[in-house]
Regions:
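Hydrophobic h-region of N-terminal signal peptides that target proteins for export
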Residues: 12-20
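Glycine-centered signal
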Residues: 1-2, 14
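Conserved small/polar residues in nucleotide/adenosyl-binding loops
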Residues: 150, 184-186
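Cyclophilin-type peptidyl-prolyl cis-trans isomerase
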Residues: 167-183
């Protein structure tokens, strides 16, 4: 089985329900996909399960970069699956590379809980402006961070935590986008 490139998040809380429910009527992974994702991520999910057992986690998130999918996992079972868009620059952890880091992460900071849907954030601050949702499958010049920000912290020293590669210091997020329809067609 081909090893997938992945970013695994250990969430101490469930993501914002409105984000998680955004595509629930569009995508439902089949049993074969479920088994493959779980088997491919056993090492990470075992670590996550140990934290879950201690009561630290409600769910885990597995992001499969090669498939451009986010999976919500609990007790090694996929609950939901969503399309995502990772960095157009590829995978990597080097500071200022604009690449998507791999490995285990946790959601350290949640921003935007009270923000209106489609609110634009700049440098994690609410601008009180609303993004226009693009209804075509295009890549706009704007790269708005919208609705919510889940700021990630790396958990693997030397891979996504530490000087020059630290995901939190690189401002790595899961966030909303105004190009929502493009996610469905990736």
């Amino acid at each position: 089985m081909e090893k997938i490139k992945k970013l695994v998040l250990l969430s101490t809380f469930l993501l914002f329900p409105e984000i998680l429910n955004a595509f629930q009527d569009i995508i439902n992974p089949d049993v074969t996909t479920n088994r493959w994702i779980i088997e491919s991520n056993t090492k990470y999910l075992n670590k996550a399960s140990a934290r879950s057992f201690k009561g630290e986690l409600e769910a885990e998130i597995v992001v499969d970069i090669s498939e451009q999918r986010l999976y919500l996992v609990k007790n090694k079972k996929i609950l939901k699956s969503y399309p995502i868009s990772s960095s157009k620059y590829g995978e990597g952890s080097i500071q200022n590379s604009f690449k998507t880091p791999l490995g285990m992460h946790e959601i350290k900071t949640k921003i935007g809980h009270d923000a209106k849907e489609n609110t634009i954030f700049v440098a994690r601050a609410n601008t009180n402006k609303s993004a226009k949702i693009i209804k075509d499958v295009i890549d706009t010049e704007d790269d708005h961070v919208t609705s919510r920000i889940l700021w990630l912290d790396g958990l693997e020293l030397g891979r996504n935590k530490g000087e020059g590669i630290d995901s939190y210091n690189r401002y790595i997020y899961i966030h909303g986008t105004h190009e929502e329809l493009s996610l469905i067609h990736i």
